[in-house]
């Protein structure tokens, strides 16, 4: 069966296609396992395992117990494995199959390589207060002169959010704060005449997102700090013309296959 096709499925001619079923013959499996030590200072925290990219799916086991399943070859998968861990050594194992039912949706002009393609790692966070997700959407206003950051932060627990924007040289540009209560906090940051991002000068700022909670004595306890790279740009289509920051751009290109 081909590892690359630009038309049709990789199993064509060898399988009576009946979605969402996939072939059992030649549906090869990769098995991975690693013994790890959980640091002592992670005790009491939520431990999450992150897989940047696994093709085509992943069955995860921790210390012999099933801990989760995911499928989507180019989207990260994260699992809370706290309930399955013990003190000392822990066995993390997972299997990934060449095809799954999601492979029907991934029929593209692409190399069909199975396995682990991006970084995999563990991280720990406060179980009661942590940043679950963040979306930063940049925009340009005032005839593409000034910048706006529309920030949506999803938080577990109740805490204070602090946002600090730094330029490429590490100089503080602007700040904002917000209060998150078991849900989503929406913040808008305005930046006067920022460096603009484009293909020729891809200037990036760093948005530092800090989450903290108040102690009984009135002091603040830091729960997490997350850096996010952001660039100020505006992409539009006007009068059948593709524009970046108000300037027309002609795009020429082809697929980039993620092989590295």
Regions inferred by a protein language model and the residue ranges of each:
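Short acidic/polar inter-strand loop motif in beta-rich domains
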Residues: 98-104, 213-216, 222-223
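Surface beta-strand/loop "capping" patches
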Residues: 127-157
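Active-site-adjacent substrate/metal-binding segments within catalytic domains
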Residues: 8-38, 42-50, 55-62, 68-71, ...
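Accessory beta-strand-rich segments of carbohydrate-active enzymes
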Residues: 22, 27-132, 157-158, 162, ...
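Aromatic sugar-binding surface patches on proteins
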Residues: 75-77, 182-191
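Extracellular recognition modules
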Residues: 93-95, 206-210
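Short glycine/proline/serine/threonine-rich loop/turn segments at secondary-structure transition edges
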Residues: 42-45, 85-89, 191-204
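Beta-strand-rich binding/interaction modules
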Residues: 60-62, 146-178, 185-187
């Amino acid at each position: 069966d081909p590892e690359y096709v630009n038309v049709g499925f990789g199993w064509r001619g060898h399988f009576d296609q009946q979605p969402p079923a996939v072939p059992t013959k030649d549906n090869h499996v990769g098995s991975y396992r690693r013994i790890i030590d959980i640091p002592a200072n992670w005790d009491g925290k939520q431990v999450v395992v992150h897989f940047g990219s696994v093709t085509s799916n992943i069955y995860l086991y921790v210390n012999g117990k099933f801990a989760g399943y995911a499928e989507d070859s180019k989207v990260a998968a994260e699992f809370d494995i706290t309930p399955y861990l013990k003190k000392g050594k822990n066995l993390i194992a997972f299997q990934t199959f060449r095809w799954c039912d999601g492979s029907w949706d991934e029929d593209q002009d692409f190399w069909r390589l199975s396995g682990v393609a991006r970084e995999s790692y563990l991280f720990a966070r406060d179980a009661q207060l942590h940043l679950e997700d963040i979306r930063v959407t940049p925009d340009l206003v005032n005839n593409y002169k000034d910048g706006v950051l529309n920030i949506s932060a999803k938080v577990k627990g109740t805490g204070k959010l602090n946002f600090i924007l730094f330029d490429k040289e590490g100089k503080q540009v602007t700040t904002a704060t917000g209060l998150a209560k078991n849900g989503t906090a929406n913040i808008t940051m305005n930046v006067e005449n920022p460096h603009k991002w484009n293909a020729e000068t891809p200037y990036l700022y760093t948005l530092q997102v800090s989450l903290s909670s108040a102690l009984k004595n009135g002091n603040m306890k830091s729960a997490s700090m997350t850096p996010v790279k952001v660039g100020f740009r505006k992409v539009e289509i006007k009068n059948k013309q593709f524009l970046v920051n108000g300037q027309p751009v002609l795009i020429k290109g082809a697929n980039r296959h993620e092989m590295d």
